[in-house]
């Protein structure tokens, strides 16, 4: 293990984090003016690719920026950043010095896109954004892109609510995290409710209460909804909770313990018992921290393990000396890169979604640590230190992270071997020519034909690919026909695939289509694909067998009418059931969301220019959508948040004739 002295990375100049909308890059970089696009043939040709790059180099200057290699279809092969674009891109023209991985990339390159930036730190941030967006095959990829949960203590109510939060941090309040998983957040919130008796209900539920709910009865809430606690006393509980989550857990415990002894001396045994239970909850939270990090404070800890060409990165999240969970990541496309390059790319992508700690501990010296720290300054709100711990609590914590990384990689490799064996057996059972790399599973969901939709989930060798999930709102007038729904979904899915990728080069054509259903669904799918002239996509329908409830058996229907079954203890059966259950879960969830939107729909939604915030303001002011419709132009103009132009738009919508 190579070690380096601890190093403080200062923010020499705050890096401005570029914001990239989902549909295109920000115009601030003037990509259209900076882009250089040179087209060539679509067959792999290293001389042709190198020629494209040489012509691009002639247009470049030694300025910082980001470059993209594109193939003949315009798909992104690679995203890179550079302090001096001209020098960096020129390196790719020396093909004899490139590793095999980059030689393959150059042979496929048919155009380049260049974006200049104000600094190398800004280029690093944009590079991470573009890698996350395009997922190029020659970049290191952070495959686990699920957002991290936080604990939110709201700051916009007299009696703040504690809750789990994911996504953009728009709500006013204090955020604590990240936590490694939803489970760790839920466990912590449950313990915090026992400790501080804070409410977890939403504001509407609280406003409607006329008596305490069950949480008050089991001593997990102080019932501010019905006045069982004053605003001042509740504020004291909130203050203690903030101190506890902010790293002052010892002081909070001592404070509660002193209050408990005082209550006992005053013979207030009921209050003493309540404080005793709160103290136990505090002890439970600290005892549940599998890692002792009292001497670390706030830090993110990363350690890497490599074996057999695979990589694992173990992350620990330490806040206030408490371990808020850990998670293992398995970056892909790491062939031919140094461990330091993999770690740097991983961290840049990781902090695209997660606010960085002011202290980032890594298990190896990173050549671009200063650059990365500078780029993360703005998101962290100040200096970011990236260092390799040498001694003390930090070193012990890093050693534990390293052990966890090795164990995680060993488990991953063992699971991959088992999974590969199951996939080979699955291919054999379903009579496929080779192990499928992309399996699409389909299901429909509706209630007596209402809010009908079709759903597709995608599975691959590494599991489910959630970014590829799709759903379709059924357009048929008569949607109580499951078979017709399945025909529509297949027609729309594969009709579009034929238009966009007729040569099947994008990797988005399935090696197997698995249908949740029986003979009827199979016939509908065959008919739909036959009308499109598609006869070479393997099809299988999975239906509950006659003894499903007792034995868990399933019947598999093939296009030629044959039926097959698997032993009840077969790993292949279990794998196929998991796939079927996943599409069922996704379809049901999407249907519920669609039904919920339909139930809560308002006539105001149809008015152009009226968003959720303005709709709420109108309903609060007038009471109902009907009263908004009946309001005069003058009444609309007096409503809060409604300008004269918006008032005129609303009035004209309901009174088209004037």
Swiss-Prot record:
The UvrABC repair system catalyzes the recognition and processing of DNA lesions. UvrC both incises the 5' and 3' sides of the lesion. The N-terminal half is responsible for the 3' incision and the C-terminal half is responsible for the 5' incision. The gene is uvrC. InterPro entries: GIY-YIG_endonuc (IPR000305), GIY-YIG_endonuc_sf (IPR035901), GIY-YIG_UvrC_Cho (IPR047296), Hlx-hairpin-Hlx_DNA-bd_motif (IPR003583), RuvA_2-like (IPR010994), UVR_dom (IPR001943), UVR_dom_sf (IPR036876), UvrABC_protein_C (IPR050066). This is UvrABC system protein C. SUPFAM superfamilies: C-terminal UvrC-binding domain of UvrB, GIY-YIG endonuclease, RuvA domain 2-like. Pfam families: GIY-YIG, HHH_5, UVR, UvrC_RNaseH, UvrC_RNaseH_dom. Keywords: Cytoplasm, DNA damage, DNA excision, DNA repair, Excision nuclease, SOS response. NCBIfam families: PRK00558.1-5, uvrC. Interacts with UvrB in an incision complex. One of its GO terms (biological process) is nucleotide-excision repair. It is found in: Cytoplasm. GO terms for cellular component: cytoplasm; excinuclease repair complex.
